[in-house]
Amino acid sequence: MTKPDISEWIAKADGDYTTALRENRARKAPNYDAACFHAQQCVEKYLKAFLQKRQVPFAKTHDLGVLLDACLVHAPLLEGWRDRFEMLSQYAVLFRYPGESAEQGDAIKAVSAMKSFRTEMRSILGLEPG
């Protein structure tokens, strides 16, 4: 299997972005678990796109802190995202299985962080705000 290129990472990230927004905005039967999960996935994939662009190797991980650490050499200002990444990282698995469920407040925070980070990363990557 070949490594995905940057555009593939971004396309997958934007698919997660759209899904997170849709689930968070749903009036009838919103799926806040999915909104949180896809918000985390969007951020994860933008971090991986950044690392791929900078030709920085990275392990298969959903831990945004680990990915952030790999990014800091090239973008030290991303350190300011660490607290929000700690919140988002737990959503990679927390609400995926029985026993825990996201509430509206969780989804609002996750989607807000995702939207802000996506805007910043698109700028860093030289992409249109879209």
Identify the function of each model-found stretch.
Residues 1-130:
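Terminal alpha-helical segments
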